[in-house]
Amino acid sequence: MEKVFPHTAMTQANADPCFETGHICPIQHVVDLLDNKWSILVLRELFKGQRRTGQLLDALPGCSTKTLTLRLRQLETHGIINRDVYPEIPPRVEYSLTARGREIQPVLIAMHKLGSDWLEQESCECSLLTGEGPN
């Protein structure tokens, strides 16, 4: 019986060398980190600058508070975003991209271009394309 590798439809016969040698496929690693509903869109919003939970919820219609909180925690755990808590009453929490998170910008730009091409329509104005956004 052929071995089927987790997270893929690959069998031993057609497997990528990464799987055969026990190495982690870099593409699979990124997919594992970002393959959750809303994660990419949260990052898109954080490229516009530091955001509070309410601002993110407003920008992501359909995303529940519970789901957003879970995604933010996952991204923070992986070092992609910062969570800054300010000692105020009521407490203020703001999220921003880490240096590691900012490395994702070229990928998001490529996704934006591909999506625009596939939609065959004029794309939205996006600060990702102009290089604007957080430093």
UniProtKB/Swiss-Prot annotation:
The keyword Transcription applies. One of its GO terms (cellular component) is protein-DNA complex. It holds the Pfam family HxlR. Signal peptide: none annotated. GO terms for molecular function: DNA binding; DNA-binding transcription factor activity. It comes from the Bacteria. GO terms for biological process: regulation of DNA-templated transcription. Keywords: DNA-binding, Transcription, Transcription regulation. Residues 25-123 form the HTH hxlR-type domain. InterPro entries: HTH_HxlR (IPR002577), WH-like_DNA-bd_sf (IPR036388), WH_DNA-bd_sf (IPR036390). This is Uncharacterized HTH-type transcriptional regulator sll1512. It comes from Synechocystis sp. (strain ATCC 27184 / PCC 6803 / Kazusa).
